[in-house]
Amino acid sequence: MYREFVYDGAQHFSIMQVPDIEQNAIMIDSVSKRFSMCGARIGWVVSKNKEVMKSILKFAQARLSPPTYSQIGAEKAFDVPETYFEEVLKEYTQRRNVLIDALQRVEGVRVSMPKGAFYCIAELPVENAEDFCIWLLDQFSVDNQTVMLAPAEGFYATPGLGRNQVRIAYVLEKEKIQRAVEILKKGLECYKKQ
């Protein structure tokens, strides 16, 4: 889903490129990520395994279709020139750099530079990120503003991993990302005092 969103000269590698596993390889993609069409629930599955595709087709035929306007928009999205992705990647690279730079300046926060997509996982100086995220929404604000973070534990298959981590999407404008990190920093300072 994020093949256009790779950074720093890296090249996307698809499971579909691995020889001799065609019958075990499935690729899933969607317009919501590829073309930033949030809410457009239109995607596709690619596989050379005919039995898998036959089963998926049965499931797809039993489902209602996405709204017509989403289908029309998705069709038009494929007409965008390749330069669209170059511009989008340039913007997301800048947003990523702003976010990571700002997070690295917050005491106790550990974060790595993402190589793809438009999210980062940040380790916070808290025991339970989910409790902290709820607290941010329910009990904390700066000038009547707060931030909404996704606890990262739910993104791991192993129970307990990511317990003190959050996933942050860098989909907002750079100025809003900087403001969000300022609020997060103040939130962490206040949370520690409890």
Language-model features: where?
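PLP-dependent class I/II
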Residues: M1-Q194
